[in-house]
Amino acid sequence: MLAALAAKLRASMGILHKQDIQITARGLGEQWNDAILLGDDCAAIRDRDGYLLLAAEGMLPQLIETDPWFAGWCSVMVNVSDIYSMGGEPIAVVDTLWSQSPDSISELLAGMKAAAIAYQVPIVGGHTNCRSPYNALSVAILGRAQKLLTSFNAQPNDILLAAIDMRGQFHPDYPFWNAATTADPQRLRENLSILPYLAKSELCDTAKDVSMGGIIGTLLMLTETSNCGAILDLDRIPCPEHVPLERWLIAFPSYGFLLSIRPENVEAVQTLFQSQNLVCAVVGEVKVGTEVILRSQGESTLFWDFSQQALTGFSDQPVANLSKQIRDN
């Protein structure tokens, strides 16, 4: 039963899309700067007494065609989430927009504007082409952090916490758990402010936002960049009522973060999320090695072994010195 579930999850589109990143890793090769790690939710660039954070997202073409307002909203929201997942705060976004006509982008722009207002992040420029043979949208974001939450610092014996806003519902056509578009904007911002507080207070140094790969794909990316293994306890993952676990494991929540926490800080971190009516549950443990193991109802199965198969291809960078520098900062 568990082995069959693992096989389905490995074949899910979110996991397959993450493997596409290997093409970029190979194609860009050794041009990267050792001082800027690849594989985090944002590029963290040293700047004076902190870091500039830079990230970008391209929107699914089918989402743009079928639900353009939501696509516009998500283009801002997912970038904002990337900044906060690194312990930062957003400064501004820019967009790159292609459309077949001026009329065909009105809903995209309306969704982008609504999210920019809700998250208080200005859209300050970009590129627009209304004479394209297709509609497309990508958005980039700039942020700043004093101290980082990064994907490179998970350590054996860390406790894995999943922090999720369960006050939402699934999009009717996509694996998106929407707890944002009708929520109070101030609440959205307050919920996100927990992440930079965790970084500044040094209660946490390792986090990743739950993205298109769902909880399971996010864990793979986190363990790959940290050169660790993990055990994920499926029975402890908070799941909405009447939602099958298989569907939830690959869902993309509007507010979802996976954190790797030193055991002595777990209770304090959980209290911060729970005080804002967010679910924050222990879902596993980081282990020595290269294997990610799924566990449920007394049964265990190997889900991934990085010694046999890469996910993104960013695990073999020369990161030891900078990872220590980030931890010491």
Model-derived regions, located:
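Short, compositionally biased
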Residues: P172-R187
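Small-aliphatic-rich amphipathic alpha-helix that forms the alpha element of a beta-alpha
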Residues: D67-V94, E107-A118, S193-A199, I215-M221, ...
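Helix N-cap motif at beta-to-alpha junctions
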Residues: S260-E267
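Active-site-proximal betaalpha loop/short-helix elements
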Residues: Q100, P185-S254
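N-terminal glycine-rich phosphate/pyrophosphate-binding loops that anchor nucleotide-derived ligands
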Residues: M1-V76, V80-S85, V121, D158-L160, ...
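Beta-strand->loop->alpha-helix junctions that form or flank phosphate-binding loops
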Residues: D34-L37, N129, V210, C228-P240, ...
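Glycine-rich anion-binding loops of enzyme active sites
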Residues: L52-L54, M59-P61, E89-D173, E285, ...
